Amino acid sequence: MAPWPELGDAQPNPDKYLEGAAGQQPTAPDKSKETNKNNTEAPVTKIELLPTYSTATLIDEPTEVDDPWNIPTLQDSGIKWSERDTKGKILCVFQGIGRLILLLGFLYFFVCSLDILSSAFQLVGGKMAGQFFSNSSIMSNPLLGLVIGVLVTVLVQSSSTSTSIVVSMVSSSLLTVRAAIPIIMGANIGTSITNTIVALMQVGDRSEFRRAFAGATVHDFFNWLSVLVLLPVEVATHYLEIITQLIVDSFHSKNGEDAPDLLKVITKPFTKLIVQLDKKIISQIAMNDEKAKNKSLVKIWCKTFTNKTQVNVTVPSTANCTSPSLCWTDGIQTWTMKNVTYKENIAKCQHIFVNFHLPDLAVGTILLILSLLVLCGCLIMIVKILGSVLKGQVATVIKKTINTDFPFPFAWLTGYLAILVGAGMTFIVQSSSVFTSALTPLIGIGVITIERAYPLTLGSNIGTTTTAILAALASPGNALRSSLQIALCHFFFNISGILLWYPIPFTRLPIRMAKGLGNISAKYRWFAVFYLIIFFFLIPLTVFGLSLAGWRVLVGVGVPVVFIIILVLCLRLLQSRCPRVLPKKLQNWNFLPLWMRSLKPWDAVFSKFTGCFQMRCCCCCRVCCRACCLLCGCPKCCRCSKCCEDLEEAHEGQDVPVKAPDTFDNITISREAQGEVPASDSKTECTAL
């Protein structure tokens, strides 16, 4: 319910309205005359109106504004179980089973679409990501390493891929562990873009989008804040490198078995039918293999046979022969026998693009569009199914189970249990992106609060590192130490971040920052896309370019920018906490132009560009909804056209000045209630006022 508008001349005391009102009451003319005659002799009689007709009651007791971050109550408008007959109960059971099957099916395709989305990004930008790593000389700069880790992980949509590239480079002595640590930190930031993209799919409902986007970006802010604090500490002390080196030196482990595939056992059979990639090519490009640059990432041959044979080859002289017995010469040329290894292709892979012979960019673009469409469709259906299931008593039980703390004095343990649950679930699905992306719609519809989602997200950061540690233990001997040390660096980095931003409640800044961004994005929804472009592309690319130009350029540009940001933050803190210490002009931002202190002018600009597209989108939504209504027979399923309702609210909900009602308004309302004044006349009088 929308809050009451502020009244310009509201009087908190109802006596000021009701004094002398009896003189104008038509139902008691005699009493009013006597009251007017004795006005100077006796006190004025006050008439108490019913709360239904009294505007003074509305002024004195305003309705409390609902907190947008409160979990919404999903009312169950269906027929109660006790009121159903036998046929209705059986039908209800089958409907529940059908919804569960549909939910699991859409969740399966949702996870598969995330896997294909990662493959699409690797096809589009995988070779470029490998070229970022190919220049190992620039990797010694920690800031450049951080930015490269962010950009590469955003391009390939997989922190596991970027981490495996780093491991292969470290094991090949192309990169040191010290230079690899900032890249791992950047990969931790880049992997959080996936669930932020998923949150954009709930943009149709402002309330859901506010919660979903805040729940997704709490992961971003945790990673950014952790890097801002821990990267300088690591550069100064190298504590991650030292701790992990001691742990690795204490191990005397041999090569283990491969890391267990849990969720991938279910999803691989389907995703392999869509596309299969040769991910070794990206690592080969990173290690400056020129032949790999001309190879396609799309895997064509799945079954090959490697054979060795002896062939005659020409050598410059007899000194190059393999042995004297295998060396022949005619005085002009010299031959010898050499063992040559060749690969023989036996069977092709079984996927859609195996015989298309399209370039990687074309295949990646096709898969990117299709995977985003499937991702959006699955997410919409998951939200709708959950919204239809999580109602009434079921919703109450689930919300209380997830969001309720342990009884005192063990309430503080609840968050740490949530961290363990998040780590365990991420270990099962073997991807933090999959877990946090599945968490996002639940936050949007109000099943999980932001405060509970935060420790679950922190646990997912821990869970993805345990998977990397198991994978490192299964590495071959030449890569075991380096891969294990890098996986442990990733693990202790996330542990350090949790110690910084979770144990003490007032240090949980990511929650407050995510809520602030959620409020802004709910009001100006274009700002969510702006945030993604700025934080995951423009800022890393700008820092990358300035770093390549030299440290003098980086310092000359970066120091003033950092100084301005710190100054603005300090001013904002003083304005909110103790504004009296500031000059009057600096107690607010009104001294700045409107476009520098408000998003309203920018919103007007973006609205002009997006207005036409939004209207066309709404028309398509209405057509699709009506077709859906015809199929399912439900007259209320057109709620998916909420963008149209938002447009109508935007046009109708303009700021109209509302004045406090005078005594005459009370009289008019009472006359209308008694039937003496027609409703149309009263509306005309109110309009004239």
Swiss-Prot record:
Catalytic activity, reaction form: 3 Na(+)(out) + phosphate(out) = 3 Na(+)(in) + phosphate(in)
UniProt cross-references to Pfam families, sorted A to Z: Na_Pi_cotrans
Region (Disordered): 1-41
Protein's UniProt name: Sodium-dependent phosphate transport protein 2B
Sugar attachment sites: N294, N307, N320
Principal location: membrane
InterPro entries: Na/Pi_transpt (IPR003841)
MF GO annotations: phosphate ion binding; sodium ion binding; sodium:phosphate symporter activity
Record's function text: Involved in actively transporting phosphate into cells via Na(+) cotransport.
Name of the gene: SLC34A2
